[in-house]
Regions:
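Short glycine/proline-centered loop/turn elements that form peptide/ligand docking sites
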Residues: 1-4, 16-19, 28-30, 38-39, ...
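Amphipathic alpha-helical packing segments from all-alpha helical-bundle domains
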Residues: 110-158, 165-176
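C-terminal peripheral helix-coil segments that are non-catalytic and often amphipathic
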Residues: 128-132, 136, 163-231
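Short linear capping/connector segments at secondary-structure termini
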Residues: 72-75, 105-112, 195
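Solvent-exposed, amphipathic alpha-helical segments
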Residues: 16-24, 70, 74, 95, ...
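Secondary-structure edge/capping motif, primarily at the C-terminal ends of alpha-helices
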Residues: 74-75, 103, 157-162
Length: 231
């Protein structure tokens, strides 16, 4: 019973933090502001999440699974998982380009060591599934090292400035280099890039963000406990 109460409280904190992070911005939202929104003392909140980065880490864990599930639904039936990989980064970059709050959230996830480690570990496991046919003799260490490079490419693609190239140029360069690291043949690289740029990737990015917020808000106690057991 006590454990259930703990998980219920953690879920309430996560739901409130998600809403505030994606409405006001991750950087602009303090632990104190989250605690106030929950009518909870800061000390009580930090009992569950010692810092804001711990909260972000919980969200990133949930986002990695959710976003991968969602992005596969946007590619044509029978399409390879490689296309889903290409669309995921493209949609993330597109939403970051038009939504500063979303950009702040995604860049924070790629900046803090705790969350960056989650992203790299998750993506390395996924890469074995997606790129295994091109890297049949690779070890786990090689996938891990590749994702260190790739996470930097992904961050640079989303982190735009006034001097940044247009999104289609950035996506072309990023996806080509990512697939090149994983030894994908040039013909396939060009085909996937062309096809993903023909998609409504900005609208898809918007929809994925909306659906993630709804997913967090609608997650019940039982579903949250199941997520915790998978970690």
């Amino acid at each position: 019973m006590a454990r259930r109460r703990v998980n219920t409280t953690k879920l309430e904190i996560i739901q409130t933090a998600t809403r505030m992070f994606l409405e006001n911005g991750y950087s602009a939202t303090s632990i104190k502001a989250i605690a106030n929104a929950l009518d909870m003392s800061t000390g009580h909140l930090t009992f569950y999440f010692p810092t804001k980065e711990y909260l972000l880490a919980e969200l990133v864990e949930m986002l990695c699974d959710f976003q991968w599930t969602q992005v596969r639904q946007y590619v044509d039936e029978g399409e390879s998982l490689l296309m889903a990989i290409c669309l995921e980064l493209t949609a993330m970059a597109a939403i970051c380009e038009e939504n500063e709050v979303a950009k702040d959230f995604y860049l924070a996830a790629y900046t803090h060591p705790m969350t960056l480690e989650i992203i790299r570990k998750n993506d390395a496991q996924r890469a074995k599934l997606v790129f295994g046919e091109y890297c049949a003799d690779w070890t786990q260490t090689q996938y891990t090292e590749a994702e260190i490079l790739i996470s930097g490419i992904e961050y640079a693609t989303m982190m735009t400035t006034r001097e940044s190239a247009p999104i289609d140029v950035r996506i072309t360069g990023a996806l080509n280099n990512i697939m090149l690291i994983y030894q994908v043949p040039e013909k396939i690289r060009k085909n996937k890039i062309r096809r993903v740029l023909d998609m409504e990737y900005t609208a898809i990015g918007r929809q994925m963000l909306v659906e993630f917020i709804a997913y967090i808000e609608e997650t019940n106690e039982q579903a949250f406990e199941a997520l915790l057991r998978r970690k």
